């Protein structure tokens, strides 16, 4: 997320407590380029039920498609928002912001385990080492949700992800594109999972051929984690094609491409490797 006091994070099933409470309790919700997918509006009938919903989208077919809205505006986001700004009075809403800060204090804080490597620890360590000016890229899956939750960046277009498009394998190509466009002096980090990485690992050859210093962090749980999560939550644990089975040795794979590879199982090992 962009470092800004008004940014309170993602909404929906992969979002955080604070942002979901804010959406549930707000009186006006302005959605810009948001389609209200099933990951965001799990129950369209109760989503933001107390709010007047204003939806802005350049694609008219998206307006009111998944959630009933009170005002639908077709248009380019930049044009519409610039047209709206003169109509809005500057208000501070101190009570509302105080309530949001109280929710943030109650928000979920992951427990650290020295014997295991936790996703938030990995992302936190990478961000501490690479800084807010790095470009962070994700593939698709649970690692993508962790990254969206915990990366803090200040660089414009510093977080590159395909959002809800589900484009597994997107990450490596996007990281290569960012590195080529910004030059070798720009730090580029790609977060991926074992499932997504398998989709496009051949691009490691491209990265090596062009001597691109991309850092690739693979969250390896040997399974399509997000698919299995949905099968657990919504399909009575009727698992299909999501049993842990992958035994890929990513260290040897990296070395086969001429890259350096490290296998880490706890934070100390990760810090040493990084």
Roles of regions detected by a PLM:
Residues 7, 14, 20, 25, ...:
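Thiamine diphosphate
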Residues 27, 33-36, 81-92, 104-108, ...:
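Structural signal for hydrophobic packing residues in well-ordered secondary-structure cores
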Residues 29, 136, 188:
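Receiver (REC) domain switch-region micro-motif
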Residues 31-33, 57, 139, 191-192, ...:
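Short beta-strand segments
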Residues 96-105, 252-254:
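Short, basic/glycine-rich phosphate-binding loops at helix/coil junctions
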């Amino acid at each position: 997320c962009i470092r800004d006091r008004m940014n309170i994070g993602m909404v929906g099933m992969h979002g955080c407590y604070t942002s979901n409470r804010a959406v549930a309790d707000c009186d006006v919700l302005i959605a810009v380029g948001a389609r209200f997918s099933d990951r965001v509006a799990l129950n369209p009938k109760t989503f933001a039920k107390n709010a007047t919903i204003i939806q802005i989208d350049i694609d008219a077919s998206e307006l009111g498609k998944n959630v009933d809205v009170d005002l639908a505006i077709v248009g380019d986001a930049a044009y519409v928002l610039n047209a709206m700004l003169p109509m809005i009075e500057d208000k501070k809403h101190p009570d509302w912001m105080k309530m949001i800060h109280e929710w943030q204090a109650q928000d979920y804080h992951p427990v650290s385990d020295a014997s295991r490597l936790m996703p938030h620890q990995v992302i936190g360590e990478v961000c501490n080492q690479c800084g807010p000016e790095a470009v962070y890229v994700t593939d698709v899956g649970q690692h993508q949700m962790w990254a969206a939750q915990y990366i803090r960046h200040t660089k414009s277009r510093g977080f590159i992800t395909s959002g809800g498009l589900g484009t597994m394998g997107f990450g490596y190509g996007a990281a290569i594109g960012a590195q080529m466009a910004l030059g070798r002096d720009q730090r580029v980090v790609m977060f991926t999972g074992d499932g997504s990485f398998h989709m496009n690992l051949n691009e490691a050859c491209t990265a090596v051929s062009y001597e691109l210093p991309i850092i690739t962090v693979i969250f390896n749980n040997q399974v399509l984690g997000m698919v299995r999560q949905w099968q657990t939550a919504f399909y009575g644990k009727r698992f299909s094609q999501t049993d842990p089975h992958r035994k890929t040795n990513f260290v040897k794979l990296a070395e086969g491409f001429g890259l350096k590879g490290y296998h880490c199982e706890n934070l100390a090992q990760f810090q040493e490797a990084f």
